[in-house]
């Protein structure tokens, strides 16, 4: 015979189980769960393993072997689909990949803080996730960059660059009473890039042929408003910042004592004459590629142990002579139209409805 307490305990047990089950169904799905659901988890694991191999080759300066490893990732039946799903997971939007069909791009102009505008190429969402996959494959090259080249990967943001510059200034002021800090930017940096020279410098001829063809094809897509092509390296493509930073590192970062973030340069020198000479030497190295230093951007900052001053660089501030860094914290904007919770049930429904996995696994887009 069931007692009242037994019935109550049983009710609470069932209720607690249902609540736990409900919470599991309501919580956001993890990346691993989504990849497992799509049958692409092994592809992701293989990507991580092969990326380590590629990084080791890049660090050793063996570009041919590094690109051969990237080729293995490219032709792997699951790696590219897994990376596509990763991009969708991060944006919480299941987008059908759109590799290279004939489309026209849009150009938007973003206001710069220092005046002027920056032309940004806006690609179709389906094309953007494909470009992002190319970027993930290329980013194994970052380990070969100078430790003075920053940007576009974890652990090398603007604040890391400013901290690095402040440390160099501190080291210089520890040795002597004064120093000179010089900053400058490149003129129309992305638009001035010679794509052929970039590909030769970075030895991209060793990339898989289809990857090269895609990059070259995307580079020559027409702009809808102007019915014209893209000048230089397209701003707005996911892989462009990686290629540009790598290119500048090869041209200058590996040879000179500058802290570099994208097209922003800063260095600390003993005297103004040394600083001026360094700027001229940097321009000589850059001229081989057609890139130019913007003359109006060259600024000399005198640092003195007995004088207080400050430098604003990359949105952050350095106080002298203490070399203290005050970081600017940017508030992240949340897209109000994005769902806050994507459960595994939601992912399952979307993947099935679109037939997304079958579309992503279709390797026809690799064949030209």
UniProtKB/Swiss-Prot annotation:
One of its GO terms (cellular component) is mitochondrion. This is Reverse transcriptase-like protein. InterPro entries: DNA/RNA_pol_sf, RT_dom. Keywords: Mitochondrion. Residues 91-318 form the Reverse transcriptase domain. It comes from Chlamydomonas reinhardtii. It holds the Pfam family RVT_1. The keyword Mitochondrion applies. It is found in: Mitochondrion.
